[in-house]
Amino acid sequence: EKLFRQFCQAGITSYQITLDGWNHDKTRPHVSGKGTLRTIIDNLVALSKLPPEEYSFHITLRRNLLAGDEDYSWYDYLYRLFGQDKRFDVLVCAVGDWGGKGSHDLSPLHQDTQEVLVAKHIAYLDKIGMLRYNQMYCVSRPNRLVFWPDGKIGKCTAALNRPQPQLE
């Protein structure tokens, strides 16, 4: 929380955090093999308690969808935690196979089912009243960067299918 306050004071106020729903601990384990979801959620809850009039930030909670992912209870959980805080919204994205280590363990959505499943999840967000990210690709924004777990810095995740998404 202390570091986050420093970021806010420095003008760094917009974040995208990927949470893979209830499967998060499987899809994004800590290097130790332990789960990371509880720590991330606890940190986000702490940030949501910062006074909005003093801390004007924006956090997009990105939900990656795998094949067959139709459990909407994750959104109910997020709504209970952050649904009344306008500083939080949700972005729903289909998982693609971008190659690399661990990609063979994923169940990416087939092209013909991606749009349908994403639309179902977006409709559920609308039904419960959870704010959602406007789905505009951040590639067009010059200051959107990705900090990868291996320490590399890249351009927005929407540019992954383009050559050279890593910054030198």
Predicted feature residues:
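Radical SAM enzyme [4Fe-4S]-AdoMet core and its adjacent flexible, acidic
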Residues: 25-154, 158-167
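Non-cysteine beta-strand/loop elements that form the S-adenosyl-L-methionine
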Residues: 4-23, 87-95
